[in-house]
Amino acid sequence: MKHIRNFSIIAHIDHGKSTLSDRLIQVCGGLSDREMDAQVLDSMDLERERGITIKAQSVTLEYKAKNGEIYQLNFIDTPGHVDFSYEVSRSLAACEGALLVVDAGQGVEAQTLANCYTALDMNLDVVPILNKIDLPQADPERVAAEIEDIVGIDAMNAVRCSAKTGVGIDDVLEVIVEQIPPPEGNPDAPLQALIIDSWFDSYLGVVSLVRIKHGVLKKGDKFKVMSTGQNHTADRVGIFTPKQTDKTELKTGEVGFVIAGIKEIHGAPVGDTLTLAKNGADKPLPGFKKVKPQVYAGVFPISTDEYENFRDALNKLSLNDASLFFEPESSSALGFGFRIGYLGLLHMEIIQERLEREYDLDLITTAPTVVYEVLMTSGETIYVDNPADLPAINNIEEMREPIVEANILVPKEYLGNVITLCIEKRGTQVNMVYHGNQVAVTYHLPMAEVVMDFFDRLKSTSRGYASLEYNFIRFDPADMVRLDILINGDRVDALAMIIHRSNIRHRGLALVEKMKELIPRQMFDIAIQAAVGSQIIARSTVKALRKDVTAKCYGGDVSRKKKLLNKQKEGKKRMKQVGNVEVPQEAFLAVLKLNE
């Protein structure tokens, strides 16, 4: 056991986690040169295209150290993006140490800090590593000082390497062996294994990635899942070297997979504990805290007969992505679908793309909303995540919106732009600290503003240098109202949104104009109105198409033309009473893209 090292790699987006893991795999000979591929561990097409890691992946490597002993390294590559921070905390729960990778050109960024504190909270040993020293703008001395100054861990003799060229990778491996403690656990105690991740394979059923804390899990053992109390037999156990490799047993301290032919999707939830069916452990291991979705949106299949497939797809995804929340919802405009809870906008985009790609669905999404706390005049408090569920205005005593604490790290020269942006987003400044060339600003911002387009705007005002990390702190009273869109006097439920009163004019006008472009002209006038309660705040009209009925008149009396025009008018009037307007799919998407 003292030859096992479990660690994960944490870093800000694009500081080279995945490339470093590729090098470690190559040096330890996990894959032959032919199978070696850039970013081996980012197995989803989506991850490769966007160049980001979404799911944490695990690998077991053998490393012969300089002292001649052979060590087993289990490491987990983690995502760097703020929306996936729960993936990081799950991976860290299975480790004794973490490599904090910092780009020697960019220096410390907000996510570096956030992930590092998560690791320190879990009592892990954090080992700093300066990556990308081959870059001309790399300045390892300055960055090492920055790590000590901002993060507060000793970094003067941090390993310097370049994952791209392979310089210093041996030093990284030596540091892992020396500085990360071996796992503690009792091989003779009853089995306790933590499920770090699980995914659904259509041939094998549920595949679970586990970390053995105590005891041993052998192939053919009968084990039980502690939360459901169900018993299963371990058909196969083994490790990833990135390839699936079967073994006869997983020992204490190891990380590996278990396949037990569990068919129902929620048979082995993430964060659960496995133990043996006979004389097993009494109590489960402390799991992870459940993450609460921050953003909700309605998602509907374009054709209603895809509803069943959509539900199956969501079930399979939710096994793999523990943070996904969904419940059925129906809308008069869009038919049946689901209300889905996400951790942020990137998460929402990724889930939607995965559903469309991996499960071949055509989907349409309504505007995302955050959860509001509503105090009713009757004294009860309700939580609303769908504009359609908002009670009537006269029943509401007070609306409270979620506030997040946003930590932004930005170079001095862009500070002004960032502050302007935060003020525009109704933020209040809490703190500002200068660290050399970087400034750390803390703002309290309404989550609804952060969710919409804050991240993109932050990146563009700071030329991509600012970085952001945020978490929910409390609900604050705010003057929020529901903006409805009426088409010919009928409310379209899927277009409603909850926004701050100061924005309604601007937002209403923009929406109405946008809808006017997108709704095709009919034989009668279509009135598009934006309303708050019963007050109309903006209107535009899609003009009717009309036939030139007087074309065949040649000369003659004006009353002849009048007669024809009046006849046309009558017809249009009748048509307007019975006609209904089809709102095209693009119009729903327009609501999402309003800010552009």
From Swiss-Prot:
It catalyses: GTP + H2O = GDP + phosphate + H(+). Keywords: Cell inner membrane, Cell membrane, GTP-binding, Hydrolase, Membrane, Nucleotide-binding, Protein biosynthesis. One of its GO terms (molecular function) is ribosome binding. Its EC number is 3.6.5.n1. GO terms for biological process: positive regulation of translation. InterPro entries: EF-4, EFG_III/V, EFG_V-like, EFTu-like_2, G_TR_CS, LepA_C_sf, LepA_CTD, LepA_IV. It is a peripheral membrane protein. It is found in: Cell inner membrane. The keyword Ion transport does not apply. It comes from the Bacteria. Residues 2-184 form the tr-type G domain. The keyword Transport does not apply. Its main location: membrane. GO terms for cellular component: plasma membrane. CDD domains: EF4_II (cd03699), EF4_III (cd16260), LepA (cd01890), lepA_C (cd03709). GTP binds at D14, H15, G16, K17, S18, T19, N131, K132, I133, D134. Required for accurate and efficient protein synthesis under certain stress conditions. May act as a fidelity factor of the translation reaction, by catalyzing a one-codon backward translocation of tRNAs on improperly translocated ribosomes. Back-translocation proceeds from a post-translocation (POST) complex to a pre-translocation (PRE) complex, thus giving elongation factor G a second chance to translocate the tRNAs correctly. Binds to ribosomes in a GTP-dependent manner. Belongs to the TRAFAC class translation factor GTPase superfamily. Classic translation factor GTPase family. LepA subfamily. This is Elongation factor 4. The lineage of its organism: Bacteria, Pseudomonadati, Pseudomonadota, Gammaproteobacteria, Alteromonadales. The gene is lepA.
